[in-house]
Amino acid sequence: MSNNNTQKPLPFGYQFIAGAVAGVSEILVMYPLDVVKTRVQLQKGTAVAGEEYYNGMFDCLRKIVKNEGFSRLYRGISAPILMEAPKRATKFAANDSWGAFYRNLFGAEKQTQSLAILTGATAGATESFVVVPFELVKIRLQDRASAGKYNGMLDVVKKIVAAEGPLAMYNGLESTLWRHILWNSGYFGCIFQVRAQLPAAEPGNKSQQTRNDLIAGTIGGTAGTILNTPMDVVKSRIQNTSKVPGQVPKYNWAWPAVGTVMKEEGFAALYKGFLPKVLRLGPGGGILLVVFTGVMDFFRNMRGE
């Protein structure tokens, strides 16, 4: 994402590398919170005798480390690590590309708040098509109930395709579309607005630029998380449900699934896992923006721009 509206986007290869570095940096720091978030989101109702139940984020962290070992907090990380390069490259490259497209379409010389939200939403939809198979694998590996079924990422893919067919790898596409549209519109929309409100960084002052990016990215990540958590909850449920021929899954489409969760578990259930999610994606959004901007600035200097 360019620091200003007149800066020409770099070629896709540079976007890809910068997005990959930013994404992998964020995932290595924040991944355990994603595991906790998924475990909490997959819980339905109240505790059942004989089944592990988590009373919030810290209880979940404690029980995972105590009962399964610290390494379990990084179970399933191979899928997101492999996903981060194309995912983050698509996020930022699509945002820059769609931004230029919409400015040209509407005859706008500079980015506006409305265009920032529209651009972010479209970039989120674009990104969704890249991430669905990786998200599906990650969810299956993170769920404790299916931990013994799979021996790593490739085994998950093999067993899903064998049991449910190749199209099952895109199970949850619709809910993922909604999740990413909401998060990206909130993220990039807030970044635009917060940057406009912050004191402008002095030319060449990297510490001020980093400060502004960290603040804008963290606020943007928090706003995106507030907007998209209900869709993330139902996405986790949809992707953790194996397809059975002739049987309609309980969680199938995003908005009906939202209604089902609200009816059976109450509105608060739509925000299960919110604390670990916002603690990850709030600061994580800041990390993403700081690293991405830093790598892109490095490439611009290297190219003499």
Curated annotation (Swiss-Prot):
Disruption phenotype: Leads to fluffy and albino colonies, and reduced conidia formation, when all 6 genes ctpA to ctpF are deleted. It is a multi-pass membrane protein. InterPro entries: Mit_carrier, Mito_2-oxodicarb_carrier, Mitochondrial_sb/sol_carrier, Mt_carrier_dom_sf. GO terms for biological process: transmembrane transport. It catalyses: citrate(in) + H(+)(in) = citrate(out) + H(+)(out). Its EC number is 7.-.-.-. This is Mitochondrial citrate transporter D. GO terms for cellular component: mitochondrial inner membrane. Keywords: Membrane, Mitochondrion, Mitochondrion inner membrane, Repeat, Translocase, Transmembrane, Transmembrane helix, Transport. It comes from Aspergillus niger (strain ATCC 1015 / CBS 113.46 / FGSC A1144 / LSHB Ac4 / NCTC 3858a / NRRL 328 / USDA 3528.7). Belongs to the mitochondrial carrier (TC 2.A.29) family. It is found in: Mitochondrion inner membrane.
